[in-house]
Amino acid sequence: MDKHFVYIVKCNDGSLYTGYAKDVNARVIKHNNGKGAKYTKIRRPVELVYQETYTTKSEALKREYEIKTYTRQQKLKMIQEG
């Protein structure tokens, strides 16, 4: 069964980026090699600070969208609580 991930990386400027991936580690490497999102390309290096696992892509994408509506403070609280 495939796994789908929603993740948050902390960028070099302190900002947070939320994304979706099937392989989180490979995606973080892409971000750090400048091959990820435009947002992270100019804010490298990035550090993985949070991830959630889902069994379907649909669930993961819904959660990614939800997290992207959160304020920075809500994201930081979620990261802190693990």
Swiss-Prot record:
GIY-YIG domain: residues covered: 2-77
Top-rank taxon: Bacteria
InterPro entries linked: GIY-YIG_endonuc (IPR000305), GIY-YIG_endonuc_sf (IPR035901), UPF0213_domain (IPR050190)
Pfam families hit by this protein: GIY-YIG (PF01541)
Stored PROSITE patterns: GIY_YIG
UniProt-listed Gene3D superfamilies: GIY-YIG endonuclease
PANTHER family per record: UPF0213 PROTEIN YHBQ
Family: Belongs to the UPF0213 family.
Protein name: UPF0213 protein SERP0126
